C-alpha cells in the first residue's frame, strides 16, 4: 500500500540522504534505487535516542529531535533535558527481547514512537553535551559491563549541523554567534558540528 518510504539499506553516518516518499507503483518504478529498501510511511516526531544498557537493562536515556532541512538532512538538533516515558517503555520492551545480554550504548531513530533504525553505537554528534564524565562512563560500560555515571544538572543543548565540502576552511562570524547567544540566553548549551 502506498505511500511508503524508500531509504538506503546501509546508512553508516546516520544521515537520511537519498530517502524519499514513494506515492504509487509508478512512482516506485521511476525512483527505484539500488541499495534501497522501503518501509511503511510513518508520521510524527523524529527522535534520536541514546541508551546506556548494562546487561540488557537501560541505565540512562537521552533524546534529541532534529529540525528537517530537506533532502533527508537536518539543520540542527535539540538534545532535550526532558524524558520521554512512553517512548522509553516501548524501547525497553524491544531491548528486553532483542538485547537482553548486551552492555553498551544503543542509538534508536524513531518516528511517531516507532523504531526505524537501531544501532549498536551512540549518536556521534553530541556525546560531549551529555555532561562531564559521560564518555569515561561509556568506556567503562564497554570495558566492564557496568554503568556508574550519575548525571548532574541535565540541560537542553543544541548541535548545529554543518554540511559542506571536505578540506575547505570555514570561518565563523563571531558577531552573528554573539547575537544568537543573546537571543537564546539561558536555553542550554550550544554546540557546533
Each model region followed by its residue ranges:
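Short, flexible/disordered intra-domain loops and linkers
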Residues: 15-18, 128-130, 169-175
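Peripheral (often C-terminal) accessory segments that flank ATP-dependent C-N-forming ligase machineries
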Residues: 140-193
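Gly/Ser/Thr-rich active-site loops/lids in small-molecule metabolic enzymes
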Residues: 126-144
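Conserved metal-phosphate-binding beta-hairpin within the catalytic cores
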Residues: 98-128, 150-169
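Short secondary-structure junctions
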Residues: 33-34, 99-102, 183-187
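Active-site nucleotide/adenylate-binding loops and adjacent lid/helix of ATP-dependent enzymes
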Residues: 1-94
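A short, polar/proline- and glycine-enriched secondary-structure boundary/capping micro-motif
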Residues: 70-76, 124-131
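Short helix-to-loop capping/linker segments positioned immediately adjacent to catalytic or ligand/cofactor-binding
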Residues: 37-38, 93-101, 145-150
Amino acid at each position: 500500500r502506498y505511500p511508503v518510504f524508500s531509504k538506503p539499506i546501509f546508512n553508516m553516518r546516520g544521515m537520511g540522504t537519498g530517502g524519499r516518499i514513494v506515492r504509487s507503483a509508478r512512482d516506485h518504478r521511476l525512483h527505484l534505487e539500488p541499495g534501497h529498501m522501503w518501509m511503511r510511511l510513518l508520521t510524527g516526531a523524529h527522535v534520536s535516542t541514546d541508551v546506556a544498557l548494562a546487561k540488557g537493562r537501560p541505565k540512562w536515556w537521552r533524546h534529541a529531535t532534529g529540525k528537517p532541512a530537506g533532502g533527508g538532512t537536518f539543520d540542527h538538533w535539540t538534545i532535550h533535558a526532558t524524558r520521554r516515558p512512553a517512548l522509553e517503555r516501548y524501547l525497553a520492551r524491544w531491548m528486553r527481547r532483542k538485547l537482553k545480554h548486551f552492555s553498551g550504548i544503543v542509538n534508536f531513530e524513531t518516528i511517531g514512537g516507532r523504531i526505524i533504525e537501531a544501532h549498536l553505537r551512540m549518536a556521534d554528534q553530541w556525546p560531549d553535551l551529555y555532561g562531564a564524565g559521560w564518555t569515561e562512563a561509556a568506556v567503562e560500560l564497554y570495558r566492564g559491563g557496568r554503568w556508574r555515571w550519575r548525571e548532574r544538572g541535565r540541560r537542553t543543548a543544541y548541535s548545529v549541523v554543518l554540511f559542506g565540502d571536505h578540506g575547505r576552511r570555514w570561518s565563523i562570524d563571531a558577531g552573528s554567534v554573539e547575537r544568537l547567544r543573546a537571543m537564546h540566553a539561558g536555553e542550554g548549551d550550544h554546540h557546533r558540528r
